[in-house]
Amino acid sequence: MAGHSKWANIKHRKAAQDAKRGKMFTKMIREITTAARLGGPDGGSNPRLRAAVAAALSINMTRDTVDRAIKRGAGGDDGVELETLVYEGYGPSGTAVMVECMTDNRNRTVAGVRHAFSKSGGALGTDGSVAYLFTKKGILSFTSADEDALMEAALEAGADDVETNDDGSIDVYTSPNDFGTVLDALEAAGFKPDNANVSMIPSTEVDLNADDAPKLLRLIDMLEDLDDVQEVYHNGTISDEVAATLE
């Protein structure tokens, strides 16, 4: 569910592959179900559910599938108790990495996460070791839109900031609680985001060289391949020059 921002060039690189897409759908359904179970089926009063639904629709999940996941979560009848865990660690070049998991078995999950870090030249950290480098925000990404009109509509709806990227795409940032309100207002104004999600935004970035870039990509891929992992956030960036050497 990466957006168009400058660090998104190395997030979820395999998202276009069919197998990866299937896993994304499975994880998104799990998030929707859990959000509905914990906060109720009304997205208007449940920001976590609203964000999950928006993210699911942005990757072309059908509304019917979304509604079934909400109904299952609200009913709470699947007998599986899942908890959300966040692990923090360090990747190559000291990159900060946060791993959001949803699991019914902590021991299995932490073992898989630790293995991914150790196999990729990283290390699992302690609680709070890198979390301070990230801020939780809603992101609405638009490939193309009238910048002035979008900015006016977004700020009027309560967005925190609007940024135009080098490629012409536009990112609208919100607080997590205002995400649904801003999304609804922009869609009502005719602006449909290409991607919409609540993410962890790094306050600082680490530029990776040609040696460390593939190591971070390996770490991300290994983590995302774990069934219990929902999201991977990091502050690594790869320049166009270095990216060209990885093709």
UniProtKB/Swiss-Prot annotation:
Region named Disordered: 1-21
GO molecular function, one term: DNA binding
One Pfam family named in its UniProt record: Transcrip_reg
Keyword field contains DNA-binding: yes
Record-linked InterPro entries: Integrase-like_N, TACO1_YebC-like_2nd/3rd_dom, TACO1_YebC_N, Transcrip_reg_TACO1-like, Transcrip_reg_TACO1-like_dom3, YebC-like
Gene Ontology terms: cellular component: cytosol
Recorded family membership: Belongs to the TACO1 family.
Name of the protein this chain belongs to: Probable transcriptional regulatory protein Tola_2714
Species this chain originates from: Tolumonas auensis (strain DSM 9187 / NBRC 110442 / TA 4)
